[in-house]
């Protein structure tokens, strides 16, 4: 079943809903990630690929752009059973061969660069938890090691353990295409382009992809307290793990996880066209105003209070008193994105702490000791 990327009113059959009915029809405005009709069509499996067993589901809903108060019942619930975090089920020497389901550009024409949402079918063989990463081995030979494969590239998983089709068989990645421009000529140099990101963004439905993992425990979503506060800070594709958190909190009907706390997302990007999953997050804010807050920093469109560019650390400073009070009360705080985001954020937090008469070094030590501090930068 191919879903149109053009925004329109349509009905889609979803898996069993919370009310127990075997099929329900939910009307949504759009199935794509963006309202930008200029973009290329969403790539999906054709009937031939499905007949080969790439996708054997009569009902496929790759993503819901808008939140619905009627949550989707996910399967298989056995994915909730393991007590131990799934780690390194597949390693670089023996990766798992998965299949590309779809590739979709999810930024607008004025975004500096291209970012794609990529759905991968692992057929339930590479289970993972929210906040973990997959490794991807692009095809070809490592130029620095003739005869050897390329090095593994890690990507944070942008879906819950049930995937975008809610059946535990897929995982989604949020990938920015890495392109190199010569600083002297200003021209693109394809020889220095990111091998793995370009492979993924150029992939077609049915293409094979070698994956490793899952890996990582630092960004796992703590679920022992459903009333906990989670402060999530990201730049660009660093929003990937938070999409997984938020879908688990607000979109999926998971019997053993009924979130009733506060999730607060700070997202820093260049401009409005660079916002990732914006409509999805806006839907949560509309449906769950008491449980979800969403603040954006658009560096090329907004100014901070000093008249400079608005970065995510400026938003943190704007709400610093509230953030510090939440941290004092046990809130978890997460950082994901480029390494370059951390110095500015750390400087801001240190300055705010000093203004409050606190030692940031002591506070940070305590946050780490209490396992409230989660950082994954690249």
UniProtKB/Swiss-Prot annotation:
Residues 93-221 form the FAD-binding FR-type domain. Keywords: Chloroplast, Coiled coil, Disulfide bond, Electron transport, FAD, Flavoprotein, NADP, Oxidoreductase, Phosphoprotein, Photosynthesis, Plastid, Transit peptide, Transport. It comes from the Eukaryota. NADP(+) binds at residues 231-249. PROSITE patterns: FAD_FR. Its EC number is 1.18.1.2. Disulfide bonds join 196-201. Residues 1-65 form a transit peptide. One of its GO terms (biological process) is photosynthesis. Expressed in shoots and roots. Less abundant in roots than RFNR2. The modification Phosphothreonine is found at residue 229. The modification Phosphoserine is found at residue 197. Residues 349-373 form a coiled coil. One of its GO terms (cellular component) is chloroplast. One of its GO terms (molecular function) is ferredoxin-NADP+ reductase activity. It is found in: Plastid, Chloroplast. Induction: Up-regulated by nitrate in roots while down-regulated in shoots. Its cofactor is FAD. The keyword Cell division does not apply. It catalyses: 2 reduced [2Fe-2S]-[ferredoxin] + NADP(+) + H(+) = 2 oxidized [2Fe-2S]-[ferredoxin] + NADPH. InterPro entries: FAD-bd_FR_type, Flavoprot_Pyr_Nucl_cyt_Rdtase, FNR, FNR_nucleotide-bd, FNR_plant_Cyanobacteria, OxRdtase_FAD/NAD-bd, Riboflavin_synthase-like_b-brl. Maintains the supply of reduced ferredoxin under non-photosynthetic conditions. Belongs to the ferredoxin--NADP reductase type 1 family. This is Ferredoxin--NADP reductase, root isozyme 1, chloroplastic. It comes from Arabidopsis thaliana. The gene is RFNR1.
């Amino acid at each position: 079943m191919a879903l149109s990327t053009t925004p329109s009113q349509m009905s889609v059959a979803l898996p069993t809903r919370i009310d127990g009915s075997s099929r329900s029809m939910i009307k949504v405005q759009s199935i794509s990630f963006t309202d930008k009709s200029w973009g290329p069509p969403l790539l999906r499996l054709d009937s031939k690929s499905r007949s080969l067993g790439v996708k054997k589901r009569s009902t496929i809903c790759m993503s819901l752009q808008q939140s619905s108060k009627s949550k989707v019942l996910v399967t298989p619930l056995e994915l909730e059973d393991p007590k131990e975090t799934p780690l390194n089920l597949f390693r670089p020497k023996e990766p798992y061969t998965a299949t590309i389901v779809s590739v979709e550009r999810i930024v607008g024409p004025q975004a500096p660069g291209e970012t794609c949402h990529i759905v991968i079918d692992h057929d339930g063989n590479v289970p993972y938890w929210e906040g973990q990463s997959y490794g991807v081995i692009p095809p070809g030979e490592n130029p620095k090691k003739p005869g050897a494969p390329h090095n593994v590239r890690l990507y944070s998983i942008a879906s819950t353990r049930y995937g975008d089709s809610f059946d535990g068989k897929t995982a989604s990645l949020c990938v920015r295409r890495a392109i190199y421009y010569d600083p002297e000529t200003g021209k693109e140099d394809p020889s220095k382009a990111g091998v793995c990101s370009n492979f993924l963004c150029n992939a077609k439905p049915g293409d094979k992809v070698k994956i490793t993992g899952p890996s990582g425990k630092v960004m796992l979503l703590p679920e022992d307290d459903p009333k906990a506060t989670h402060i999530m800070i990201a730049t660009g594709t660093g929003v990937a793990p938070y999409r997984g958190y938020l879908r688990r909190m607000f979109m999926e009907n998971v019997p053993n996880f009924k979130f009733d706390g506060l999730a607060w997302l700070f997202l820093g990007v260049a401009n409005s066209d660079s916002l990732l999953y914006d409509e999805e997050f806006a839907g949560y804010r509309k449906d769950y105003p008491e449980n979800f807050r969403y603040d954006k920093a658009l560096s090329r469109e907004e100014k901070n209070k000093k008249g400079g560019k608005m970065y995510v650390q400026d938003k943190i400073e704007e709400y610093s008193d509230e953030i510090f009070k939440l941290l004092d009360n046990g809130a978890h705080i997460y950082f994901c994105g480029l390494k370059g985001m951390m110095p500015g954020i750390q400087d801001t937090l240190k300055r705010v702490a000093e203004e409050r008469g606190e030692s940031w070094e002591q506070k940070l030590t305590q946050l780490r000791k209490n396992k409230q501090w989660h950082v994954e930068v690249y």
